Amino acid sequence: MKVVLQRAKQAQVTVEGETVGAIDHGLVLLIGITHGDTEEDARYLAEKIAHLRIFEDEGGKMNQSVKDVGGAILSISQFTLYGDCRKGRRPNFMEAAKPEHAEPLYETLNSHLEQLGLHVETGRFGAMMDVQLINDGPVTLLVESK
């Protein structure tokens, strides 16, 4: 499982012109799931994301987590994270999990984040989405479960 994590001042996701998820201060997560991923991967990433110290403290050091600063999560499924561009001119998405495997794990990750006390907004799984954000920093990290 891969997550591109972006610290954001604000973000929203729309589907067919309708806002389906929006946050102020917090994290935008682009979540990719592959064939061998399990609920344990989802739990591991939820813990890592909730406690990763990437927000600045009063001294200007990255010393606080999204939980510490009262931030929220905007979680978006993103199968294209498993696109392989090494051959040809069109990405190969064979490493991305099928929706019937990926969607329950996506929901599990979001549920674990909520259980850790975070407010979670989501996109719509499998939909074409427009994502807008104001990247804070910018701080962008790739977090993987394996």
Curated annotation (Swiss-Prot):
Keywords carried by this UniProt record: Cytoplasm, Hydrolase, RNA-binding, tRNA-binding
Statement: the UniProt record of this protein carries the keyword Transport: no
Short motif (Gly-cisPro motif, important for rejection of L-amino acids): ranges: 137-138
Cleavable signal peptide: none
User: Which reaction equation describes what this protein catalyses?
Assistant: glycyl-tRNA(Ala) + H2O = tRNA(Ala) + glycine + H(+); a D-aminoacyl-tRNA + H2O = a tRNA + a D-alpha-amino acid + H(+)
Known EC number: 3.1.1.96
HAMAP family registered for this protein in UniProt: Deacylase_Dtd
Name of this protein: D-aminoacyl-tRNA deacylase
Query: What's the gene?
Result: dtd
